[in-house]
Every structure is written in C-alpha cells, then in structure tokens.
Amino acid sequence: MLYLNRPVKKRIGLGTWSWGNKLFWNYKSLNDDDLRETYNEALRRGFDLIDTADSYGTGNLQGRSELLIGKFLLNTPSAKKKRIQVATKLAPYPWRIGDRGFNKPFLKSLERLNNKLDIVQLHWSTAKYNPWQELGLLNNLCDLKDEGFDFQIGLSNICLLYTSPSPRD
C-alpha cells in the first residue's frame, strides 16, 4: 500500500473490549485460557497491534483486559514482543481532572501491561459534559512524555470537531 508515495506497513489489530466484561460479553475467568489462545493465534497470523483500555472490564474487573494482556506478554518471545504495539485508552472519567488527572491511571495501566505500552489514547471526548477537562488531560499525557515515558499519544472515539486545540505540537 502506498501513501504519499511511501510504502506503509499494513496493520491489523486485536481488540479486547470483551476481555473482563461480564455485563456485555458474559466474561468468565474460566475462559482466560481461551483468551490466551486467541492472543497467541492473533500473533501467529501477523496481528501486531493489541488494543485495550483501562475501562475494559466491569465492576471489580476494571482493567482486566490490560491485566490479561500483560500476563500474556510475559510469555511472548522477545522477538515477537518487539514487533507488537500495545495501545491503551484512558477514560476521561469526571474525577480525572486537571493536568495530573491521568498520572495514576497511566501508571496503573503501565503496571498491568508489564511496561509494554506504545500508544496511549484519550478514550472519548469530554466536550459535551466537561469541555475544559480535555485539554488538561491531553497536556498531562504530554507531561508524562516529558518525564521520560516513551509512547505515542492518540485520540479514540473523538470527532475532530470536538477536540481542543493541540496541547503541544
């Protein structure tokens, strides 16, 4: 595939919304071995992006998807692990405010994912209920990068119409 006359690597990702979600997906921890096999099969077939979120999981299983991925990564050969990108999304819950609102959730996600975190995304826009919250959280992600954490910043489920001006170029 060419984009602006440059070859672009084709990517296919494994989404993990259902992992840990009892409410919508009837998750049971008894099925974790099946999820491990799904993960392994995805890697065998060339999937190189694993998508998750700190909110994937319900109730006391919050973050369960990240925890499972982190566990599976421990048994992934290092050559395969290097080619995988792990993307998570941090939920802009109303209590996560200000330019430090993502610090704790980011560190918890990093821990659950065993320090394999390549892309961190704002999960959805706050424009409809707390428009002032969004810019602070995006700046917080930039601050984390400035502190030495190495990841790309992304947006998920956000229409560009609702995004704040770029926190930093």
What name fits each language-model region?
Residues 1-84, 146:
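N-terminal binding-site loop/beta-alpha segment at the start of enzyme catalytic domains
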Residues 11-13, 49, 83-87, 116-121, ...:
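Structural preference for beta-strand elements that scaffold enzyme active sites
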Residues 17-19, 55, 89-93, 122-125, ...:
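Active-site beta-loop-alpha junctions enriched in small/polar residues
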Residues 30-41, 98-111, 161:
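Short, acidic/polar
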Residues 32, 65-67, 101-104, 133-139:
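Charged helix-capping and loop-helix junction motifs
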Residues 53-65, 93-99, 127-132:
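Acidic-and-aromatic substrate-binding clefts and catalytic sites of carbohydrate-active enzymes
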Residues 101-121, 143-147:
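CE4/NodB-like, metal-dependent polysaccharide N-deacetylase domain
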Residues 162-169:
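Conserved small/polar residues in nucleotide/adenosyl-binding loops
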